[in-house]
């Protein structure tokens, strides 16, 4: 075949709107390669659709043979005739194929579908199924060249799209509807059993042709099993029996899912929830295994794109799923599927949302952060996530955006401002720098900067030279004493209580959020040239003497605390420090105020007028049990 004339179109894409094509949105294909995506540079662009990848797919034509193929380059996947195209692989396009750029089974209004029409006479003749004695063209889901002569009042794809079109009746015109030709048995090469047909044709036959008891069922097709994936790339392979047909016919006829099933369906895997987790604050729910893969590449909710703060188990929904499966045991996942999901589950307890590094997207809000919403598991996709690695793992590659290792070079010490980098020191930099993580070693995520570090907490119990990695009170992990936290604005998220840097604003509202009483304390310290650090050291000394009390008897000046636990205990000590200031050392305007009935427990003391009128550095006297 001679080279194609660029001015003469070799194909056409018509937008599908329900059962009709939109003639106003027909696109003629001239170029050798036609790209589809969200980028504005694509030939067919969807700039406002977040479900479309930047470069979603591309349609190419072989100028010599005239063959047209589609290559998927997306994250969410491209669907042709409701069969998933494996990423980075090509799929031959034939006259009448329906291309789903966006396919949502439970949200058909969001579907973006196009009908491909070949305008190349050579390609039509190449796929002409004139031979009805078992020709290869009939087995590979081809259409008649008579399509060129038909009107497009009601175009039909080459495979069954019963959820999109509403005309299941047979047609006397071959080429408009492949199902009609197949029902007569001629295009299947004389085979009377659908189980002897190729998987591509098997997928194209509607439910009404598979079983006489299932006529009239127009529900969406059941989810294909994964063994179908390699059939789409080997169209000449015809198995002795089709397991898909056997699987579908052994179950109840396809029906629309009931409201309860829709409510209990995970939008990522499109199956009933398994080990359900909820995201906070939006409270959307997903399978724990599904969201485990998602959270490694995006910190946004898959449903509403709201930033996720916490991940929690949803026990109520888990109980509802169990009750639903008791009534519908046929919808239960297989044992192999459940074991696979349990192995991929990384959410074993309530946890904070880990921080995700987004460095490979060239557009804000790129859908490359979206999870693979398909039937293809992670082992068959090239976007599977590696094991968690930190800067001490062997083979770790430091990105240009990676912060410098702790401790930083000495020439930068003088240029730091308070809060721009860790402000406290550690006694274990040498041992930390020499450590190398074992292969696939355990890691823990810092609560402050959300960066991974080696989990050596158990090792520290036997080796005091290993730096502390968690708070003594809340047991949350922090990396500051291990190798220095690099989060901007961190004052030192983990340190001994006496070395904690609480910041200059730690005295604001320090006394039960009572700004008036807090200002009295600040003025008292300023008049004597004292700082909050001096007050903390005096209070810790009073704790040692037994004068001041803390709620946890383990806390002293050397106890390793995080910033939040340290600030909370600092406020407790500050109240006792203010309570022990002699009245003679305070202004008369302060000591002349009567005590509030509610004392330190007063909920009105945050109001300036009430705080100025009454003293709240006292105990409650009214209604005290």
From Swiss-Prot:
* Bias type Acidic residues, positions: 362-380
Q: PANTHER family of this UniProt entry? A: E3 UBIQUITIN-PROTEIN LIGASE CHFR, UBIQUITIN LIGASE PROTEIN CHFR
Major localization class: nucleus
Q: Which reactions are catalysed by this chain?
A: S-ubiquitinyl-[E2 ubiquitin-conjugating enzyme]-L-cysteine + [acceptor protein]-L-lysine = [E2 ubiquitin-conjugating enzyme]-L-cysteine + N(6)-ubiquitinyl-[acceptor protein]-L-lysine
* Zinc finger boundaries on the chain: PBZ-type: 594-616
- For the region Disordered, give the residue spans: 123-171, 205-229, 350-386, 401-427
Transmembrane feature ranges:
none
Comp. bias regions, Low complexity: 158-171
**Known EC number(s)?**
2.3.2.27
Gene Ontology CC annotations of this record:
nucleus; PML body
Q: Which InterPro entries match?
A: CHFR_Znf-CRD, E3_ubiquitin-ligase_CHFR, FHA_dom, SMAD_FHA_dom_sf, Znf_RING, Znf_RING/FYVE/PHD, Znf_RING_CS
Per its record, how is this protein called by name?
Answer: E3 ubiquitin-protein ligase CHFR
Give the keywords, sorted.
Answer: Cell cycle, Cell division, Metal-binding, Mitosis, Nucleus, Transferase, Ubl conjugation pathway, Zinc, Zinc-finger
The lineage's top-level taxon is: Eukaryota
Where's the FHA domain? 34-85
Chain segments annotated as coiled-coil in the UniProt record? none
